[in-house]
């Protein structure tokens, strides 16, 4: 993130930079979803154990994750009767010194944590479902998930088409939404992946769409 500050000078001098450095800084990949509450699962951002425990008590099955993680690192599924729930909260929050996110567990994860790509304000018609391996909650490919490309569902398309013009207006040319069922869980703007897998499995030329979007933006 610090490097984006140095890119501001280049942008001020006329360089076209995608994604826009200021927009990258403004879009915390975990927190950005809070701008679109109509699409997200029940969510709480907190560091105090009492607040996190209250969320777990209210929603039961809960996902806890740090705000700066990636690849499924340090993501915990905690149930209300989990004997380790307090120590998990203490560990993730560094005993109340670090803010984390709590989200209601979505059973639709069994069908995959979907990566939906938006390129230059246009929605790619396929997602990559990252399906958890047996015994896992996390679908991330880095955590052993299996990637299966498939056409967008109506719900996924509705979310993506709503967000696409908003994010493109902010200079975000390449965006990866994470969607479970019909709920938005993250907006990735730093290094959205799954282009290779979608292209290989469907024949849809996602890299070509990126080049086309760049040429159009710079024309």
Map each language-model feature to its residues.
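Hydrophobic beta-strand scaffold residues
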Residues: 17, 62-63, 174
């Amino acid at each position: 993130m610090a490097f984006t500050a140095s890119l501001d000078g280049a942008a001020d001098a006329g360089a076209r930079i995608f994604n826009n450095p200021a927009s990258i800084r403004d879009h915390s990949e975990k927190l950005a979803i809070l701008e679109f509450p109509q699409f997200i699962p029940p969510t709480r951002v907190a560091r105090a154990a009492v607040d996190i425990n209250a969320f777990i008590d209210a929603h039961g099955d809960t996902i806890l994750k740090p705000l700066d993680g990636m690849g499924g690192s340090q993501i915990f599924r905690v149930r209300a009767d989990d004997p380790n729930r307090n120590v998990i909260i203490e560990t993730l929050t560094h005993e109340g010194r670090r803010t984390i996110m709590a989200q209601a567990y979505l059973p639709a994860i069994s069908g995959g944590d979907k990566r939906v790509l938006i390129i230059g304000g246009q929605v790619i018609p396929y997602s990559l479902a990252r399906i958890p391996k047996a015994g896992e909650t996390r679908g991330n490919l880095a955590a052993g998930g299996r990637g299966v490309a498939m056409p967008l569902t109506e719900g996924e398309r509705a979310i993506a088409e709503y967000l696409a013009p908003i994010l493109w207006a902010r200079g975000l040319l390449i965006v990866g939404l994470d969607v479970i069922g019909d709920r938005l869980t993250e907006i990735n703007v730093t290094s959205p992946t799954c282009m290779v897998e979608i292209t290989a499995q469907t024949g849809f030329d996602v890299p070509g769409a990126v080049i086309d979007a760049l040429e159009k933006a710079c024309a």
